[in-house]
Regions:
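Conserved AdoMet
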Residues: 39-113
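Conserved SAM/SAH cofactor-binding pocket of Class I
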Residues: 103-202, 229
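Conserved Class I SAM-dependent methyltransferase catalytic core
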Residues: 221-284
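Active-site beta-alpha loop architecture of Rossmann-like, nucleotide-cofactor-dependent enzymes
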Residues: 78, 196-199, 251
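Conserved hydrophobic residues forming the short capping helix/wall of the S-adenosyl-L-methionine
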Residues: 23, 115, 163, 234, ...
Length: 286
C-alpha cells in the first residue's frame, strides 16, 4: 500500500478499497479479505462497513497495514485472524495446525451418518490437528466417547482450547504417533492424514502451503505413506464390523480401495466432495 503517514483521518470505505487493490494479486477475494482483516482488528462484524463509514484510529490503521503486508507475502488469512470456520464452528488456528478445509466436512458428514447407526459408538480420530473433525462430531453426539490423537503437542493444545471454547467435554486428547499410544478398540476410526505429494506440486503451489506445517500436509511415497500405515495397522484397533474412514487426494482413490481390500476390509466405498472429486474412502472390518 502507498505510504499514508500524512493522512490525519482514516475511514473504513477508503482503506478497504485501497486494501482490496493491494491484495488483488494474492487472492481471488481481495475485498472480502480486506473487510475480514479490518473487522478483526476493530472487533466488529464486517457487515458494519456497509451500514456506515467508520472512522479508524491511527493505531488500528497501523495494525491493519501490518496484517495486509503479511497477507500480501502469502500468509493465510486464517493465521492472521487466528480463526477458521468449520462445520459452522469458529475454531482457533495457528501455524502449528493445518487450516481446516471445506472438503473435510465430507469426512464429518459420513462419520455422523455411521455414528447414528451404531449404538454406544467409540470413535478414534488420527491426526486431529485443530480438533476440527472430532469437535464437530462430538458437538452433535455428546453421549459418545471420542479419542483424538496427534503427534504434535502444540496441535493438541490448540485442539483442547477449541473443545473448551465449544463446551465439548467428551473427547480425550492424546499425543501419539499414530497408534503408538492407542491401547483399546473402537467402532470407528476416522482420519484426514497428510497425503500431499510434494514432488507433484509446482513452486507456486508449494509457496501457497508454505506457512502450514509440513508434517500435516506431506507424505512420502507419492503422498501414500501415512494412508498406507493407517490402513495396515487399523485392523488391530477396530472392533468387529468397525469402520475406517480416510480422507485422501482425488487421485488416491484406487490406491485406498486396493489397500483396504488387501488388508481384509469389505464394503469399500468412495465418496466425492463438493467439487465432484473422490475424497473419502470407507471400509468395514469383518
Amino acid at each position: 500500500m502507498n505510504n499514508q503517514s500524512v493522512r490525519k483521518e482514516y475511514y473504513s470505505n477508503d482503506i478497504i478499497d485501497e486494501a482490496a487493490d493491494y491484495l488483488s494479486t494474492i487472492t481471488d477475494s481481495p475485498k472480502l479479505e480486506s473487510e475480514i482483516l479490518l473487522a478483526d482488528i476493530l472487533k466488529t462484524d464486517r457487515l458494519d462497513f456497509y451500514k456506515r463509514n467508520l472512522s479508524i484510529d491511527h493505531l488500528s490503521y497501523k495494525k491493519y497495514r501490518s496484517l495486509l503486508s503479511e497477507r500480501q507475502k502469502g500468509k493465510p488469512l486464517a493465521y492472521l485472524t487466528g480463526k477458521k470456520e468449520f462445520w459452522s464452528l469458529v475454531l482457533q488456528v495457528n501455524e502449528a495446525v493445518l487450516i481446516p478445509r471445506p472438503e473435510t466436512e465430507l469426512l464429518v458428514e459420513k462419520c455422523l451418518s455411521f455414528i447414528k447407526k451404531c449404538n454406544n459408538s467409540n470413535v478414534l480420530e488420527l491426526g486431529t490437528g485443530s480438533g476440527a473433525v472430532s469437535i464437530a462430531l462430538a458437538k452433535e453426539n455428546p453421549l459418545i466417547r471420542f479419542t483424538a490423537i496427534d503427534i504434535s503437542t502444540k496441535a493438541i493444545e490448540i485442539a483442547k482450547k477449541n473443545a473448551v471454547n465449544h463446551h465439548v467435554n467428551n473427547i480425550l486428547f492424546k499425543t501419539s504417533d499414530w497408534f503408538s499410544e492407542v491401547n483399546e478398540g473402537f467402532n470407528i476410526i476416522v482420519s484426514n492424514p497428510p497425503y500431499v505429494d510434494k514432488d507433484e506440486l509446482t513452486q507456486d503451489e508449494i509457496m501457497k502451503l508454505y506457512y502450514e506445517p509440513d508434517i500435516a500436509l506431506y507424505s512420502k511415497d507419492s503422498g501414500q505413506s501415512a494412508i498406507n500405515h493407517i490402513i495396515k495397522n487399523s485392523q488391530a484397533y477396530l472392533r468387529e464390523n468397525g469402520l475406517l474412514l480416510i480422507e485422501h487426494a482425488y487421485n488416491q482413490k484406487d490406491f485406498c480401495q486396493n489397500e483396504l481390500e488387501l488388508n481384509g476390509y469389505v464394503d469399500i466405498k468412495t465418496y466425492d466432495d463438493l467439487n465432484q472429486l473422490p475424497r473419502v474412502t470407507i471400509g468395514k472390518k469383518i
